[in-house]
Amino acid sequence: YPFKTGEEYVWFIAIEDKEVVGFVPVEQKSRKKAVINNYYVKAEGTVREEILSHLLPAIVAEFRPESWLLNSVTLVQDKGTFEKFEFVSMDKKWTRYVKMYR
């Protein structure tokens, strides 16, 4: 996937039958802040929610709230799934995305 990446990124990848079905790059910023942006899930509806529901707990475990502020630029269609993992909407909203934090 054509993303710029480096040592400051941690990638969480969902694989099914040797095929990548989703990924979430998390950029580690200064002062224990991490940002989810440009994630991809190769599904819609309940399958999409299921894939994200496998990826998000791994991210939350890696970036624990006691140590990290975790922000996300979340697709509006995924907002409910992120809320299940205690992400909260911020005031910032675009047409297709909403900024969230945990």
Go through the PLM ranges and name each one.
Residues 61-74:
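Conserved GNAT acetyl-CoA-binding A-motif
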Residues 1-11:
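Active-site rim helix/loop that mediates acceptor-substrate recognition in acyltransferases
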Residues 46-61:
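Conserved acetyl-CoA-binding loop-helix of GNAT-fold acetyltransferases
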Residues 74-94:
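Conserved active-site alpha-helix within GNAT-family acetyltransferase domains
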Residues 15-17, 99-102:
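Active-site beta-strand termini and strand-to-loop segments that position acidic
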Residues 32-44, 95:
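Conserved acetyl-CoA binding element of GNAT-fold acetyltransferases
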Residues 13, 18-27, 35:
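Conserved beta-strand in the GNAT
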